Amino acid sequence: MPKENPVIAFLNKMADLILLNLIFLLCCIPVVTIGPAITALYAVSLRSVRYGDGYVIQTFFRSFKQNFKQSFVVGMIGLLFVCLLVIDLFFWRNVGPAFMSVFMTVVSVCVGYLVFIVFLWLFPVIAKLENPLRVQIKNAAAMAVAHFFPYTLFVSVIVLAAGYMAYTSIITDVLLLLMGFALLAYVCSFFFYKVFACLLYTSPSPRDTR
């Protein structure tokens, strides 16, 4: 079987990322479906890293449906935590006693980072593993800590850097709307895949689509 032309392969991958990004953004419009949309985004990205195929629409909506309940709960918890963290930081920086401001701000940021790295793993874990939610959270936390160097650290830096660039650059915002979220998930999936490969893929199986 002849190899696919590298240029054609690249263009196909870009088309898949643009399509995936569009579907992801549309599914995020209701806000409450952000969690299921992120899980489905990783389901497609992880499959693409492993198999190199497309199947964007089929894989996305299958994962969106199968993992909706857990992802919805996780998404709501994540949104609630972000709101509480913002309120907490605002209080200690603007309302709280001056002598406690710096200390509590540092504590809040550290706690926020710990929760953040667990959530980084949680959506891919839901996309790949079938377990009760408490087990999913436990597994995500264990992976985040056990693989902090280098995978968790690299992924968190990539995501935070992308967030900072989006905050400071209009060009980055445009790229995110075009294909950025899908590209970000795809890049991060290379790191996640290395861990999942050790846990799940002891032998290649084309039936493993989750």
Which ranges hold each PLM region?
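Structural signal for membrane-spanning alpha-helices in multi-pass inner-membrane proteins
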Residues: F24, C28, L85-F90, A162-A166, ...
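Helix-adjacent hinge/juxtasegments
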Residues: S71-L114
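Selective recognition of hydrophobic, aromatic-rich stretches within alpha-helical transmembrane segments
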Residues: F24-L46, F99-N131, T172-L199
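Membrane-helix interface segments
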Residues: K13, V56, F68, P97-V102, ...
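Interfacial aromatic "cap" segments that immediately flank transmembrane helices
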Residues: N12-L22, S63-L80, V125-G163
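Short, Lys/Arg-rich, polar N-terminal cytosolic tail immediately upstream
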Residues: M1-P6
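Interfacial loop at the N-terminal end of multi-pass membrane proteins
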Residues: I38-Q66
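Single conserved hydrophobic/aromatic residue that forms the stacking wall/gate
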Residues: Y201-R210
